[in-house]
């Protein structure tokens, strides 16, 4: 592997891409520590130091921003508005015929869809930054009751400048991600999420060691993390390959077809999206409870019930609800991203068939049958990966947004594998051996 890294940096154009990617990542991480105008940096740091563990409402977003959210930096929103916009646009392709038509138009349609995603990202950034500033006016909702004030001046012009700065920061982050995709290595947006999550690892691990002062627990957590990573790598690489044969056909004097290939159906077809959906949906009751919390101490019954059962991840009701949502969203997302009927029609159009299965409707039914059978273990796997770290780390006083949680590991492994494969293909094009042998 070290030889492969050396060869990658010895190849001029590949070295240029790698250094460009590292430079953009460095700019992104630097921007994550620059506070927006109107925020007291000293007060924010003191509040973070004495903060309660952030769970539910803002924990996931703070994790994806590499801690920039709670620091109220210019990149506080990170890549979350873009992720949300991409998911919404992808879901709308099923509902709106215009979007479905654009999806089938190839590169031109994809460019138009990307443009819509950018517009929606800016709209969501305005909404999310306004919400964050509202929380910042009452910082106890962000950092706990020990924090009372982080905005020396909360006049309307100052708040507007803060919202515009965070929205502009989201636009810059989106541009940086696209620069990496165009001129660097890997998918830019994915790499920015990767670096955001990875940047929280050292601090979170050290916090566990400092909390108990026991090195055996610290080493145990690290070993558990490596074990989970190994399991995720194994499952993410697992796939069911359905053989496809193409019939020979003659065009003029040329003979085409007669080749064989396969349709790869991954065990985890949905990726990390169901976990994000489930985490976001499960955060809504906690958000409602926070806004309806009584200042006199006499809480409504439903607010007390939510705070007892749906805020901390160590409660059985929270865990059961969480895994049920993950199972539902896994089947839902796979059903809208992989259409067996469309795949069968495309195969029939180009003369392809699955050996032993008739073309057309029987092929679609067979693909649907295989997809359902492979999605069941995939959904269970997502649920277990999300719950096992939760159960284990609650025992050492961590919260469900700890970096070794299911969401973090799935993203880090997925992005890492994708980036390594891209570097691998670049090396093999130049007749070098890559990382994967």
Locations of the language-model features?
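N-terminal cationic and glycine-rich segments that engage phosphates or anionic surfaces
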Residues: 1-103, 107-437
């Amino acid at each position: 592997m070290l030889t492969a890294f050396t060869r990658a940096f010895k190849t001029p154009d590949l070295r240029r891409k790698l250094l460009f990617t590292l430079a953009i990542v460095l700019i992104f991480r630097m921007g994550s520590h620059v506070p927006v105008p109107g925020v007291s940096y000293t007060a924010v740091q003191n509040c973070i130091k004495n903060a309660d563990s952030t769970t539910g409402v803002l924990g996931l977003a703070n994790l994806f921003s590499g801690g920039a959210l709670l620091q109220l930096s210019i990149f506080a929103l990170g890549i979350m508005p873009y992720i949300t916009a991409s998911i919404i646009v992808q879901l709308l392709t099923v509902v709106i015929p215009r979007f479905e038509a654009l999806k089938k138009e190839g590169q031109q349609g994809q460019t138009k869809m990307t443009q819509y995603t950018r517009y929606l990202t800016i709209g969501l950034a305005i909404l999310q930054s306004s919400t964050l500033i509202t929380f910042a006016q009452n910082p106890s909702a962000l950092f706990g009751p020990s924090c009372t004030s982080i905005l020396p001046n909360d006049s309307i012009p100052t708040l507007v400048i803060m919202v515009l700065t965070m929205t502009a920061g989201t636009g810059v982050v989106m541009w940086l991600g696209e620069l990496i995709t165009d001129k660097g290595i890997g998918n830019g947006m994915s790499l920015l999420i990767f670096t955001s999550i990875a940047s929280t690892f050292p601090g979170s691990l050290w916090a566990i060691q400092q909390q108990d002062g026991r090195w055996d627990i610290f080493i145990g957590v690290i070993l558990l993390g490596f074990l989970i990573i190994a399991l995720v790598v194994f499952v993410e690489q697992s796939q069911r390959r359905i053989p496809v044969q193409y019939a020979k056909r003659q065009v003029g004097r040329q003979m085409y077809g007669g080749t064989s290939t396969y349709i790869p159906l991954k065990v985890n077809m949905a990726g990390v999206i169901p976990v994000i959906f489930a985490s976001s949906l499960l955060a809504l009751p906690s958000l409602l409870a926070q806004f309806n919390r009584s200042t006199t101490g006499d809480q409504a019954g439903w607010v007390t019930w939510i705070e007892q059962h749906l805020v901390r991840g160590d409660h059985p009701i929270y865990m059961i609800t969480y895994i049920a949502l993950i199972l539902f969203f896994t089947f839902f997302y796979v059903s809208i991203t992989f259409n067996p009927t469309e795949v069968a029609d495309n195969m029939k159009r180009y003369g392809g068939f699955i050996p032993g299965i008739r073309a057309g409707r029987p092929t679609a039914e067979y693909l649907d049958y295989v997809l359902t059978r492979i999605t069941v273990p995939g959904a269970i796997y997502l649920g277990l990966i999300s719950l096992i770290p939760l159960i284990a780390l609650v025992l050492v006083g961590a919260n469900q947004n700890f970096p070794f949680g299911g969401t973090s590991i799935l993203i880090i492994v997925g992005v890492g594998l994708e980036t390594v494969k891209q570097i691998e293909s670049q090396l093999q094009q130049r007749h070098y051996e890559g990382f994967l042998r």
